């Protein structure tokens, strides 16, 4: 029997990590965001109809280590000392909960978390509005920013919308 994989819940998280190895800086960012125990599969930008937004703590309780978990993720890495890295996901909630909303991902160098968050919201809002011809019910973002240390170690910054099926 084939079942549809339509998420019922979503939570938002972010993290930053540093390490001499790029891959391990990504792992450290996942740990900081509390999503390192899952096999993450990135998906595009649709917030399913009737998808409930829950806290990170509530969402994590419903997931198991090793589980394949779908997410919308913004990710940026660098080992350039002093460079600021910023990631954000933005969300546009539908006016009618029987319709879908949008989640955007955005990342940039040398941009504040506030500016990246505003840009992610603008993207999600634009995708929603061009489809519905109306403003979303609500918008928000989960931005994260960090600066590469002088050691030249790799820094990775992530923001994610994590789905619970």
Swiss-Prot record:
Pfam families membership: PvlArgDC (PF01862)
EC number annotated for this UniProt entry: 4.1.1.19
N-terminal signal peptide: none
Cofactor note: Binds 1 pyruvoyl group covalently per subunit.
Keyword Metal-binding annotated: no
Site (Cleavage (non-hydrolytic)): 44-45
Keywords: Decarboxylase, Lyase, Pyruvate
Cofactors that this protein relies on: pyruvate
Secreted among keywords: no
Biological processes per GO annotation: arginine catabolic process
Entry GO MF terms: arginine decarboxylase activity
Chain positions found as Pyruvic acid (Ser): 45
Leading EC class: lyase
Catalytic activity: L-arginine + H(+) = agmatine + CO2
PANTHER family per record: PYRUVOYL-DEPENDENT ARGININE DECARBOXYLASE
Protein family membership: Belongs to the PdaD family.
This protein's name: Pyruvoyl-dependent arginine decarboxylase 1
Organism of this sequence: Methanosarcina mazei (strain ATCC BAA-159 / DSM 3647 / Goe1 / Go1 / JCM 11833 / OCM 88)
């Amino acid at each position: 029997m084939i079942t549809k994989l339509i998420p019922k819940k979503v939570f938002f998280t972010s993290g930053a990590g540093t390490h001499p190895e790029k891959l391990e800086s990504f792992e450290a960012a996942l740990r900081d965001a509390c999503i390192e125990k899952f096999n993450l599969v990135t998906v595009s930008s649709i917030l399913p109809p009737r998808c409930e937004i829950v806290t990170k703590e509530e969402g994590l309780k419903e997931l198991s280590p090793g589980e394949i978990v779908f997410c919308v993720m913004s990710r940026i890495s660098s080992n350039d000392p002093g460079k600021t890295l910023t990631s954000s996901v933005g969300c546009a909630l539908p006016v009618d909960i029987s319709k879908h909303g949008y989640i955007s991902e955005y990342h940039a160098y040398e941009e504040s978390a506030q500016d990246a968050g505003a840009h992610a919201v603008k993207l999600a809002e634009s995708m929603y509005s061009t489809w519905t011809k109306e403003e979303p019910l609500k918008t928000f973002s989960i931005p994260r920013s960090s600066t590469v240390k002088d050691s030249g170690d790799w820094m990775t910054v992530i923001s994610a919308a994590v789905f619970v099926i």
